[in-house]
């Protein structure tokens, strides 16, 4: 298994590392880059220094992760239809984000994919994945923390998994926005689930997760502050869906509330901010999502990244330790 993990890491890294400079050069040469319309971002932070930075970098680690997974499966003669879950999850939500990015980058529509059409597309993708899960793999029981497994009827199961995919793909999208932040957090989450997969003898899941880790390591080289490329919605939404399929594949979806705690808190801060301001015209946080509050307070992106990565590392280590024990 160690050699398979190393192969997944290395192949994912090499493919992404080779592809990213090509994408940066292609988008830059065409002038198809993200440009801030003013010196101040919507969060009240000066981001004019990011003008001219290409986006859509998520395409590289999505494809490199999947290619690496398939290559390792072929090399080690691993045959499993379960790969369908990971491919459909990663590609479908990545495609939705890619459409959003393309509208912004190539057609210069600031809002990209409008909210309602985007939500409908997410629901359709989540429904497709859920139907496959319910029909092929996942048992009709749901494990709750500190409670026995409860039976799930099809409709309840369908709604739960649908909400899970849509929710986590958007949660990852909220966290993206500071150079390197989501890439580092996601890398640790996928590494954690990969280690758990070893304990649970889920070889395919292990290969997929470490293919993602290798691809993200390569992407991080180009995305760390000051970023040479942004992942865009295609990357963030695919990562969120990938986290969700990991938790569901282990038949412990609630585990993602721990491993994805930063994502959950970030999303909660946005919901609280919007609701309280709507009804009482008061802002609970200086800015939401939370990372931008630190940014407005004058923290550098490296300092914010270091704080969030350290917290995520602790969360991941505790989660893996508790699971293994």
UniProtKB/Swiss-Prot annotation:
Highest rank taxon of the organism: Bacteria
User: Which GO MF terms are attached to this record?
Assistant: metal ion binding; phospho-N-acetylmuramoyl-pentapeptide-transferase activity
Q: What is its EC number?
A: 2.7.8.13
| Entry cofactors | Mg(2+)
Can you tell me which residues the record assigns to a coiled coil?
Answer: none
**Substrates-to-products reaction catalysed:** UDP-N-acetyl-alpha-D-muramoyl-L-alanyl-gamma-D-glutamyl-L-lysyl-D-alanyl-D-alanine + di-trans,octa-cis-undecaprenyl phosphate = Mur2Ac(oyl-L-Ala-gamma-D-Glu-L-Lys-D-Ala-D-Ala)-di-trans,octa-cis-undecaprenyl diphosphate + UMP
**Pfam families noted in UniProt:** Glycos_transf_4, MraY_sig1
Q: May I have one GO cellular component term?
A: plasma membrane
User: Which InterPro entries would you find in this protein's record?
Assistant: Glycosyl_transferase_4 (IPR000715), PNAcMuramoyl-5peptid_Trfase (IPR003524), PNAcMuramoyl-5peptid_Trfase_CS (IPR018480)
Which keywords fit this entry according to its UniProt record? Cell cycle, Cell division, Cell membrane, Cell shape, Cell wall biogenesis/degradation, Magnesium, Membrane, Metal-binding, Peptidoglycan synthesis, Transferase, Transmembrane, Transmembrane helix
The free-text function statement in the UniProt record for this protein reads: Catalyzes the initial step of the lipid cycle reactions in the biosynthesis of the cell wall peptidoglycan: transfers peptidoglycan precursor phospho-MurNAc-pentapeptide from UDP-MurNAc-pentapeptide onto the lipid carrier undecaprenyl phosphate, yielding undecaprenyl-pyrophosphoryl-MurNAc-pentapeptide, known as lipid I.
Family named by the database record: Belongs to the glycosyltransferase 4 family. MraY subfamily.
Xref: PANTHER family: PHOSPHO-N-ACETYLMURAMOYL-PENTAPEPTIDE-TRANSFERASE, PHOSPHO-N-ACETYLMURAMOYL-PENTAPEPTIDE-TRANSFERASE HOMOLOG
Q: Which HAMAP family match?
A: MraY
Protein name, per record: Phospho-N-acetylmuramoyl-pentapeptide-transferase
């Amino acid at each position: 298994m160690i050699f398979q993990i190393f192969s997944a890491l290395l192949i994912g890294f090499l493919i992404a590392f080779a592809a990213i400079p090509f994408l940066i050069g292609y988008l830059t040469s065409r002038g198809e880059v993200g440009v801030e319309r003013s010196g101040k971002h919507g969060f009240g932070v000066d981001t004019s220094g990011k003008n001219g930075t290409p986006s859509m970098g998520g395409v590289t680690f999505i494809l490199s992760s999947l290619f690496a997974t398939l290559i390792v499966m072929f090399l080690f003669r691993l045959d499993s239809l379960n790969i369908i879950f990971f491919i459909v999850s990663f590609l479908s939500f990545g495609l939705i984000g890619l459409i959003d990015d393309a509208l912004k980058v190539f057609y210069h529509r600031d809002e990209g994919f409008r909210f309602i059409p985007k939500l409908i597309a997410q629901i359709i993708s989540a429904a497709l994945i859920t139907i496959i899960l319910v029909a092929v793999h996942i048992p009709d029981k749901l494990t709750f923390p500190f409670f026995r497994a409860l039976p799930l009827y099809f409709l309840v199961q369908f709604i739960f998994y649908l909400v899970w995919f849509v929710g986590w793909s958007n949660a990852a999208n909220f966290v993206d926005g500071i150079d390197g932040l989501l890439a580092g957090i996601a890398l640790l989450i996928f590494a954690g689930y990969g280690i758990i997969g070893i304990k649970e003898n889920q070889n395919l899941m292990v290969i997929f997760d470490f293919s993602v880790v290798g691809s993200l390591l390569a992407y991080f080289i180009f995305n760390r502050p000051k970023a040479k490329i942004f992942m865009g919605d295609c990357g963030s939404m695919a990562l969120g869906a990938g986290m969700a399929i990991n938790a569901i594949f282990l038949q412990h979806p609630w585990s993602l509330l721990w491993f994805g705690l930063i994502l959950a808190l970030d999303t909660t801060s946005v919901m609280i901010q919007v609701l309280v301001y709507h009804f009482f015209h008061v802002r609970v946080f200086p800015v939401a999502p939370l990372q931008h509050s630190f940014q407005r307070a004058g923290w550098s992106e490296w300092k914010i990244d270091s704080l969030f990565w350290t917290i995520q590392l602790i969360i991941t280590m505790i989660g893996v330790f508790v699971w293994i024990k």
